[in-house]
Amino acid sequence: ILGVRTDRALPAGSGRWADVLAMADPGVLPTVEIGTDDDVTIFYTSGTTGFPKGAQLTHRGSVANIFNMLTMTMAANSAEAKGIAAGDIPAPTTAPSAYPAAFMAPTPLFHVTACNCILHPATVMGAKLVLTYKWEPGRALELIERERVTTLSGVPTMSRELLLHPDWETRDTSSLQGMGGGGAPLQPDLVHKIAGALKGGQPSTGYGMTETCGIITANSARWLIAKPASCGPLVPTLEAKFVDEDGN
């Protein structure tokens, strides 16, 4: 484990990236020109064909996804779900968290959800990132309690398995402010189950694609509860077009 751009004390067995650079031969790490539309990652995705293809994600798209996730105001962008007028000021949907931000990524980091939609925003926020070696709901509940996880974003089956696990009733999950994710539709019944199970937290969902560097639409809290089958409105930097079977 390497610490980057921090003066804080690091855990035993970890080091600092600056120390690694200091030991390197300057000629080994040449200066590289990087453009905003250069590739930053290649994620292999099966899409709808079932055969993995390497999707090339750019710096511009990945940074835009971070800002979409961090700056999107659901109270404004999801207003029509409850018929709220533009000038209305909705009441807060959740109480401020008493815990520092801690994101759990139960899906692999080679997937756009975990990397671009969890790791990147968590890094920008300076939040804790909690990883799992493999998915096991009992172990995940243990980590949620121990690490005081505030946001869990996985596939819907993961949320359902957590709520159905016998340890849900005995583990302290009061730190959870948000629970949901993407990768598949968040079923309406699960939306209401999450809303009823969390102690002050809210369900969340979204739709995205690897090729768009992350999310396309997002929905959460009272607006998702009001329209649990909705994936939400578009994020600020994307456009959508509806096309019927005749291409219209």
Whereabouts are the PLM-identified features?
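Conserved pre-ATP/AMP-binding loop-to-beta segment of ANL
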Residues: 25-44, 51, 94-102
